[in-house]
Amino acid sequence: EGPINGGEYGPYIQSQRKDIYHTVAKYLVSIGRAYPCFCSEDDLSHMREEQEACKDRIGYYGKYAKCRNLSYDEVKEHIDNGDKWVLRLKSMGDFNKKFTFKDLIKGTIELPENDLDQVLIKSDGVPPYAFAHVCDDHFMRVTTVTRDDSYISSVPYHLELWKACGFDAPKFAHLLPLNKKDGDTVRKLSKRKDPEAAVAFYHERGIPVEAVKLYFATLLNSNFDGWFMQNQDKNYNDFMFTFNKMCTSGGSLFDIEKLINISKNYLSRLSAKEVFDNLDNWSKEFDKDFNELINKYKEY
């Protein structure tokens, strides 16, 4: 199911779902939970400078939300003048109040309420990630959101959005990032800087897909290693992955040597024909001379 194969929850490309986002946005306007904002980039820049000078939090909220209480006539005048605008959520939160939510991996987390009037629809009619993801998750019947723990700080805003839209919020499972040793330091694996973050890295090196899956299974649940050592004849799908066995502090360290060892072990259990087929498919794309050689002497 997806943009190629289709399915009952399509369309699957966000640019094709604008009518859905606009319908929800209009609903929020109709119940007084969204409003047009005509602040220019200069206005927002001056706002940030004022907040920095006053040592206030950065963002569009409270007294800094200049367009929050514009009258109908003021809004109409801006629109008649052709002024650019974005649509913002009218937050009902209080940053000085705390709330708790249950994360499936980290347990109970306490956070301040959201009070930022975030952008729902940009001036070009396209929604930012947060609003699109709330709409998509609801209409695609998503029950559990699994994502990087850097999104924990966004939970107050996302939960307020779900509630404002009249949607039931999904459950959350925030995963620790995969880390990499970089000299004397350890940092988060980056899809921009690190080739290991791309699928092509493993494909080009001839590491079988199943071996990569096995390796990441060892990172996903702390007890997978022990289970697999005793069940090497079984498929990793036979293992019952659970949220409570996922890493809750520090994050896992990417270990290429362990991945290579798992790959060797996996290949050693394949038949001669399976090894040849894997090698044939890989060399067709990455080493044509070698491919010609192995096909010339197939009997060996």
What is the predicted role of each segment?
Residues 14, 27-174, 179-191, 198:
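Active-site cores that bind ATP or allylic diphosphates and position pyrophosphate for catalysis
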Residues 17, 21, 154, 208:
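Hydrophobic (often cysteine-bearing) scaffold residues that line and stabilize catalytic clefts
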Residues 1-9:
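A glycine-rich helix N-cap at a beta->alpha junction
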Residues 8-19, 31:
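Short coil/turn segments at secondary-structure boundaries
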Residues 2, 17, 52:
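Charged, often glycine-rich, active-site loop that binds/positions anionic groups
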Residues 165-300:
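Catalytic adenosine-cofactor/nucleotide-binding cores of aminoacyl-tRNA synthetases and other
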Residues 22-29, 213-216:
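Non-transmembrane alpha-helical segments in soluble domains
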